[in-house]
């Protein structure tokens, strides 16, 4: 039987011959994609795929939202400024005004908005730099299985050894502490506090903690809200800055705009990227409490921190948050997802599986070596795009666009069931 993958193999030759060996997603999904809309993609042969990947979280509002397309096309046709570094432009002005009125003010948040560059690692690097400058300390505490980006500072607070080793140099001035429930039900809070209290621990008072409330690349590990609150309490007790990395978990992914809202905490610095750009265009922002916004002009900069098309799409995306309807629908779709996940795990006890995540950032931990990857490969051959996550790629990760509907969930999960069955029969 000729599969989707077989038909596309010849189309992949140029990528295999000319592109660096570092390429990743094109290996697992070896087709040439040509069109995308909503929660679906199509390859050049017309094969349709349900997207449970959403650009690794950059497409929370789906592929090519019509309202975002329109504002960008109109702007280009009227010769709007595309590239502007940090010069003042109309799209930048409108984004700042809308973000303040729609996101910050209703949540009683007071932050300066920094545009550090176009990517998630840019916002993380800026957060680490300003935390060290403000406190005069150099150490930052990260957490086991964390992922914060691929540049040196971000790698230093990342847990994954494969990614860390790619730096090629020692990654200093960072310490890893156990994430919530890293060792069964043991209290990692007491462990962390003991390190800070004990002058013999070898741990210097850090400038900051950097935390993902839900670890995406690390395995869809969702910290309990009470644990997140205790981390903030530690920071306040010891005068340590709290950085929340919401690059993947933010912009509605967990059901609220910020992933930490339900914990009721007030971070000093917040990192946003991926879906902050609305339509998948590169954009990142760093939110900094005003008292910590101690940069000198140009002290942190970047050529592509003024993406006006992204500002336009981002502003349009914020309209989804004017009422709580969008948030409530995310929670409804999350419940449907989790119901199907539970039934699947019960149907296939051979997976030795556990369920993970919050909102529409979900996963099935598969505790059989290599099986999660085989399931994802089978799913792709049947028209469902999924990836794995976790230190050993042991988690089947669900990151659908937030605009997915019940039909998309049911069809996607039907494919997943077929894929699990096929993988188990190999």
Curated annotation (Swiss-Prot):
Does the keyword Transferase feature in the UniProt annotation? yes
The biological processes this protein is annotated with in GO are: ectoine biosynthetic process
Looking up PROSITE patterns in the UniProt record yields: AA_TRANSFER_CLASS_3
Q: Which residues carry this modification: N6-(pyridoxal phosphate)lysine?
A: 274
Molecular function as annotated in GO? diaminobutyrate-2-oxoglutarate transaminase activity; diaminobutyrate-pyruvate transaminase activity; pyridoxal phosphate binding
Alphabetized CDD domains for the sequence = OAT_like (cd00610)
The entry's keywords: Aminotransferase, Pyridoxal phosphate, Transferase
Q: Name one Pfam family in it.
A: Aminotran_3
Q: Identify the metabolic or biological route this protein is part of.
A: Amine and polyamine biosynthesis; ectoine biosynthesis; L-ectoine from L-aspartate 4-semialdehyde: step 1/3
EC assignment? 2.6.1.76
The source's superkingdom equals Bacteria
InterPro entries given for it?
Aminotrans_3, Aminotrans_3_PPA_site, Dat, Ectoine_EctB, PyrdxlP-dep_Trfase, PyrdxlP-dep_Trfase_major, PyrdxlP-dep_Trfase_small
Cofactor(s), by name: pyridoxal 5'-phosphate
Family in the record:
Belongs to the class-III pyridoxal-phosphate-dependent aminotransferase family.
Q: Which NCBIfam families match?
A: dat, ectoine_ectB, PRK09264.1
In Swiss-Prot or TrEMBL terms, this protein is called Diaminobutyrate--2-oxoglutarate transaminase
What gene name is listed for this protein?
ectB
């Amino acid at each position: 039987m000729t599969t989707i993958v077989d038909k596309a193999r010849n189309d992949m030759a140029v990528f295999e011959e000319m592109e660096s060996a570092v390429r990743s997603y094109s290996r697992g999904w070896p087709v040439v994609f040509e069109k995308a809309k909503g929660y679906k993609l199509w390859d050049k042969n017309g094969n349709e795929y349900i997207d449970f990947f959403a650009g690794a979280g950059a497409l929370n509002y789906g592929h090519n939202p019509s309202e975002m397309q329109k504002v960008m096309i109109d702007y280009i046709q009227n010769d709007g400024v595309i590239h502007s570094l940090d010069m003042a432009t109309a799209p930048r002005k409108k984004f700042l005004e809308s973000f303040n009125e729609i996101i910050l003010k209703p949540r009683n948040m007071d932050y300066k908005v920094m545009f550090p560059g176009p990517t998630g690692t840019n916002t993380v690097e800026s957060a680490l730099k300003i935390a060290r400058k403000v406190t005069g300390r150099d150490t930052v505490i990260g957490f086991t299985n964390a992922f914060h980006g691929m540049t040196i500072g971000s790698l230093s607070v990342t847990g994954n050894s494969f990614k860390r080793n790619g730096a090629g140099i020692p990654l200093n001035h960072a310490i890893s502490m156990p994430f919530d429930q890293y060792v069964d039900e043991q209290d990692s809070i007491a462990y962390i506090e003991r390190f800070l209290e004990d002058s013999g621990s070898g741990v210097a008072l850090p400038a900051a903690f950097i935390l993902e409330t839900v670890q995406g690349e690390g395995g869809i590990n969702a910290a309990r809200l009470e644990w997140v609150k205790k981390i903030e309490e530690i920071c306040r007790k010891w005068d340590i800055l709290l950085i929340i990395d919401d690059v993947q978990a933010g912009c509605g992914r967990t059901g609220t705009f910020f992933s930490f809202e339900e914990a009721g905490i007030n971070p000093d610095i917040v990192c946003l990227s991926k879906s902050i750009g609305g339509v998948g265009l590169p954009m990142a922002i760093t939110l900094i409490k005003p008292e910590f916004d101690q940069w000198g002009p140009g002290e942190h900069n970047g050529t592509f921190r003024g993406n006006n098309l992204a500002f336009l799409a981002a502003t349009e995306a914020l309209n989804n948050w004017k009422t709580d309807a969008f948030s409530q629908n995310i929670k409804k779709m999350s419940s449907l997802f989790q119901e199907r996940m539970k039934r699947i795990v019960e149907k296939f006890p051979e997976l030795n599986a556990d369920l993970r995540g919050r909102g529409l950032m979900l996963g099935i931990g598969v505790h059989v070596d290599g099986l999660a990857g085989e399931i994802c490969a089978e799913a792709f051959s049947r028209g469902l795009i999924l990836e794995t996550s976790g230190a050993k790629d042991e988690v089947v990760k669900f990151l659908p666009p937030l605009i997915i509907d019940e039909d998309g969930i049911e069809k996607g999960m039907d494919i997943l069931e077929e894929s699990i069955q096929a993988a188990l029969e190999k």
